[in-house]
């Protein structure tokens, strides 16, 4: 930080170099998640709660493990029962999550998944008709596979399927 400040002409500095010490800046960065939340998190919570309050189940997609952890924590705070499927999820646990989600009498409201870990052999179309894309990696094959987790030709035409793409304006 100090190197950046010294690159500013002296007459424009006006004592700015004393605003934050290096340690203060490190502390702010370390505590960022405690003080700041992405705007999409608020929209995701609002949308998820609205759908779940109507008795719907929700499938949420994200491509980053840290983001999945943040979303899981934030939705759990809202009372949403959520499970996650990532590359770290063992096959047996994956099957248990899928079976519980597909069971209409279970209290599992949502699954959050990484497309690579949930791309094939997981059918959720009978229980879920709402897919929310928190972020994407723009891999076409993975995207098309993710769409089909809640939509099947010959199996889900009777129920409309809704996809939500959370994006920042002008992105």
Where are these predicted regions, by residue range?
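SF2 helicase/translocase ATPase core recognition
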Residues: 109, 113-171
């Amino acid at each position: 930080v100090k190197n950046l400040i010294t690159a500013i002409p002296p007459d424009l500095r006006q004592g700015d170099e004393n605003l934050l010490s290096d340690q203060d800046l490190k502390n702010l960065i370390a505590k960022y998640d405690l003080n700041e939340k992405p705007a999409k998190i608020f929209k995701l919570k609002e949308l998820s709660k609205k759908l779940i309050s109507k008795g719907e189940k929700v499938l949420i997609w994200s491509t980053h493990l840290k983001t999945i952890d943040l979303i899981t924590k934030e939705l759990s705070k809202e009372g949403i029962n959520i499970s996650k499927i990532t590359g770290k999820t063992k096959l047996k646990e994956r099957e248990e999550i899928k079976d519980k989600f597909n069971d209409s009498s279970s209290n599992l409201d949502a699954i959050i998944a990484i497309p690579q870990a949930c791309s094939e052999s997981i059918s959720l179309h009978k229980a879920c008709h709402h897919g929310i894309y928190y972020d994407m990696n723009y891999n076409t094959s993975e995207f098309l596979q993710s769409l089909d987790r809640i939509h099947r030709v010959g199996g889900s035409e009777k129920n409309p399927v809704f996809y939500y793409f959370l994006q920042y304006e002008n992105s």
